[in-house]
Design a protein with these regions (language model features):
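Feature recognizes metal-dependent phosphohydrolase scaffolds
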Residues: 2-664
Length: 664
């Protein structure tokens, strides 16, 4: 008996109002039946390929390359399609063209003597690759991905077989005409972009787009124009969201981080932040101060700053760091419930002797020049500092590019995501030592597990979207800073953020930040199962996907934990972490055959990729293999389609029994 035959007129009476609305889209029996056929067909297609990336930290060139080569999938498909019919050098050339069509075309045109012949060969090759990557999608979905100007032509090339004698000449004429009408370049670019788009069906960014790298704004530009993605906010993302919400402590932190790694371009060129007031203040205040410990951490082999500029960045770095400590103390005093009074450390300095007194011990300070700190009231901003904070605040609040990127983060992002039985979050779900969920008080009420992450998500949105001056917004703006460095914050979950100690104290013991229990307990399968169940993602093929803590592959650490229940996929996209991890990042790939982890070696540069065909070397590890291919019907999207089909079947019953009249 079919599902439709179980639907009776009596059973749908309560749904008639909704079915009347549905009938506007499907006004006849024929329309509803056709849609059911289409949806049933989609359910039996292989699931699309999902890519998971995390901790990009502003490394835009490596990130963009991984999207272009689909973590090695494009190269693999080119090898499968052409096998021994093309030389390795030719396959490499084709891959580079697919990744960087505009740039590669310029190089080809400068060297090729018979360009029309090259166009003919290349267009035929691209059609074959495009046919392969589009084969798991419906024609309708492919059509929606096509550039409007070439939509009809590409459809003809994709869906007509050149093997058939009657069609061979037809396809050749299409390709020849593309060349003779001087449209080959534009058509090749369109085909290459289509291949990139179809190879990755959906992209999950599991946090930390921002941080030390130079191009977080470029990554955000890429994502804002990407076809299908979501973001699980990381601690560095939250810091920028706090800055965009108007939290001055967050603003000071993001500027300090940019100075620490010598990345002024992200602020000035990327977001139009005016740093001149900070530069003027720093030069005046620290004119005779070498500011040695504030020298930016950067690869001086790649440095593009002269000595004078480096000196200025160093002074600006010190100036904003001291301002940050003062601004943070204001929040700590305003919110005693945060329990962070122990992070007010300027008051623990003996300014006369140049020592830091902490828990009964004395530590010699690495820098003792504090011209803006009043020992009697160390957290009071000077008049000049307060004026500077106001100017920088204005600059952040009026950056149109920053507003655009933050809207993107809020629209496509959240604290966590459950997708196809996988639970994605950047850092932690705070736990007690016994593995139970840690109860965290927020404004007098306790939250834990999923409730805690939901509450954090709500507060972050309140901080950005609510009207100025409202009490809820004021608290939320303070809480967004707490999310960055608070001991019970799910995006931090450490006992302290040792920023002051790392700058001013030599003793490495004081630099240590003790991680919460989550980071050890997540190795246990039962704990992971408990977390998955809490978020409604339990099942034999459910997993937690984490970032945040780099996997020290070089020391033998594995990204797969808890008997395959949890994957930590921070492998070192950030160049600064690569000596620690031994690799240059992971991509977790989830396709119809199962899950595999792609381990990347360092990306040299975009220029070398274009000119020399240097690709990222990647190693694939199969984590989970499905003996039966996973179809759309097995996914979250499939469940939605099944519901739509059921509703359409109800509509058919309504039409056939006269409860709703067809609109013929």
């Amino acid at each position: 008996m079919t599902a439709q035959s179980n639907i009776t007129p009596e059973s749908i009476v309560g749904d008639l109002r909704y079915l009347q609305l549905l009938s506007r889209s499907f006004p006849t029996i024929a329309d509803a039946s056709t849609e059911i056929i289409n949806l049933e067909a989609i359910l039996n297609l292989p699931k699309g390929t999902e890519h998971f990336l995390t901790d990009i930290h502003g490394e835009y060139e490596a990130f963009q390359h991984v999207l272009k080569n689909a973590s090695g999938a494009v190269k693999r498909k080119v090898n499968e399609i052409f096998g021994n019919t093309l030389r390795e050098a030719e396959k490499k050339e084709l891959c580079t063209l697919i990744y960087y069509p505009e740039e590669k075309l310029q190089l080809v045109k400068a060297r090729e003597k018979d360009l029309d012949d090259w166009y003919l060969i290349t267009l035929n090759q691209l059609v074959k690759v495009c046919q392969n990557v589009s084969s798991k999608y419906t024609r309708s979905k492919v059509r929606k991905s096509l550039p409007a100007e070439f939509s009809y032509i590409i459809q003809e090339l994709l869906h007509e077989s050149s093997i058939e004698p009657n069609k061979h000449a037809y396809i050749n004429v299409i390709i020849s005409t593309i060349i003779t009408t001087k449209r080959a370049d534009d058509f090749i670019i369109a085909m290459c972009n289509l291949i990139q788009r179809l190879t990755i069906d959906s992209l999950h960014i599991v946090g930390d787009i921002y941080d030390r790298g130079p191009g977080a704004h470029i990554i955000m530009d890429t994502l804002c124009n990407y076809h299908n993605f979501d973001i699980q906010w990381g601690n560095h993302d939250i810091l920028w969201m706090g800055a965009a919400s108007g939290n001055d402590s967050c603003i000071a932190n993001v500027i300090r981080m940019s100075m620490r790694y010598g990345n002024l371009g992200k602020l000035e060129d990327g977001y139009g932040i005016n740093l001149l007031p900070l530069a003027t203040f720093a030069m005046d205040t620290y004119a005779d101060d070498p500011c040695t410990i504030f020298m930016p951490k950067m690869n001086f082999a790649d440095a593009h700053y002269n000595e004078k500029t480096l000196r200025l960045i160093t002074q600006m770095h010190k100036a904003i760091t001291i301002i940050q400590f003062k601004l943070e103390a204001e929040i700590i005093d305003r919110r005693p419930e945060f329990g962070m009074a122990n992070r007010k450390l300027l008051e623990k300095i003996d300014f006369d002797r140049g020592v830091f007194v902490y828990e009964g011990k004395e530590y010699v300070l690495r820098d003792t020049n504090f011209p803006t700190v009043d020992p009697a009231n160390p957290y009071r901003l000077t008049e000049e500092e307060r004026e500077l904070v106001e100017k920088i605040h204005y600059s952040f609040m009026n950056s149109e590019k920053l507003k655009k990127h933050m809207r993107c983060l809020f629209t496509y992002g959240g604290m966590y995501l459950v997708s196809n039985s996988n639970l994605l979050y950047h850092a932690s779900v705070p736990l007690n030592e016994d593995g139970s969920f840690k109860r965290v008080k927020i404004r007098g009420k306790e939250y834990w597990g999923r409730r805690l992450l939901d509450k954090a998500d709500q507060l972050i949105r309140t901080a950005y979207f609510d009207e100025e001056g409202e009490e809820d917004k004021e608290f939320a703006m303070d809480y967004i800073w707490y999310m960055w460095c608070g001991p019970e914050a799910p995006l931090f979950d450490k006992d302290k953020m040792a920023t002051f100690e790392r700058y001013f104290v030599e003793d490495k013991e004081l630099h240590k930040e003790k991680k919460g229990h989550y980071y050890t307990l997540r190795n246990r399968e039962d704990i992971c199962d408990r977390i998955l169940e809490e978020f409604g993602a339990s099942g034999p093929h459910s997993h937690i996907i984490n970032g945040h803590v780099p996997v020290k592959t070089i020391q033998g650490e594995q990204p797969m934990k808890a008997n395959g229940k949890l994957f930590v996929i921070d492998g070192g996209f950030s160049k600064a972490y690569q000596p620690e991890t031994g690799i240059a990042g992971y991509t977790l790939v989830y396709h119809s055959h199962g899950m595999q982890l792609v381990q990347h070696e360092p990306f040299q540069s975009r220029q070398k990729a274009i000119e020399e065909g240097l690709d990222i070397k990647s190693t694939n590890f199969v984590l989970e293999f499905n003996s039966q291919r996973m179809m759309v019907k097995d996914t979250d999207k499939g469940k939605e389609l099944v519901t739509q089909i059921q509703d359409l079947k109800k509509l058919l019953v309504a039409y056939r029994t006269g409860l709703i009249k067809e609109k013929i």
